[in-house]
């Protein structure tokens, strides 16, 4: 399974318009494309950062959709009042585990990291055996995912929790897990963000 993420930064005051556009126009169009297995959208209402991720059954389906998705992305940038500092990345969905569906008010903690590309499988095994069992024990746990780029060693891990209170409750626990990942897995943590999960239409099967 594969995923394409689009990260933009725009005017926080236009965020509701951007959410409505993705919900009412982008998602209906994307879900009819061959191989699409879902779409999610996360937002930081303070900074205006917004991440839209589409999921695909295989690499071929993801790449075949690129030309049709491009004008929607351009329209989203214009509608959101975003600058041209957008980032589009393609990922392998390495880990996906659900505890229960995310409801209204769900939030996500997103961690970007980089490791040795040559040790990708070893790092994934460490994540599954060492970190995942403790992540799913966090209060309010809904789901977690790990997307990887095997070529450059980048990864993005997302933990979805029931609400903002649970984000605050687990902040220290998450910090300790990141430190353990740095120590045991030898990864570099590039960025961490706490965001609202505003759309979650995912039919991606679990990998755990």
PLM region descriptions:
Residues 1-50, 57-208:
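Short S/T/G/P-rich N-terminal loop/turn motif that feeds into the first structured element of a domain
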């Amino acid at each position: 399974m594969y995923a394409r993420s689009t990260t933009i930064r725009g005017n926080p005051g236009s965020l509701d318009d951007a959410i409505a556009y993705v919900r009412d126009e982008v998602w209906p169009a994307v879900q009819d494309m061959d191989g699409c297995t879902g779409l999610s959208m996360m937002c930081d209402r303070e900074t205006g950062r917004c991440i839209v991720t589409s999921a695909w059954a295989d690499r071929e389906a993801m790449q075949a959709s690129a030309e049709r998705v491009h004008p929607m992305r351009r329209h989203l940038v214009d509608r959101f009042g975003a600058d041209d500092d957008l980032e589009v990345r393609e990922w392998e969905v390495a880990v996906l585990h659900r505890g229960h569906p995310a409801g209204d008010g769900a939030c996500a903690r997103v961690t970007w990291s980089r490791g040795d590309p040559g040790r990708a499988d070893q790092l994934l095994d460490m994540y599954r055996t060492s970190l995942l069992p403790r992540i799913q024990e966090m209060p309010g746990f809904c789901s977690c995912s790990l997307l990887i780029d095997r070529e450059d060693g980048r990864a993005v891990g997302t933990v979805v929790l029931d609400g903002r209170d649970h984000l605050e409750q687990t902040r220290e626990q998450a910090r300790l897990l990141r430190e353990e990942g740095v120590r045991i897995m030898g990864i570099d943590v590039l960025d961490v963000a706490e965001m609202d999960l505003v759309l979650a239409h995912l039919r991606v099967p679990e990998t755990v």
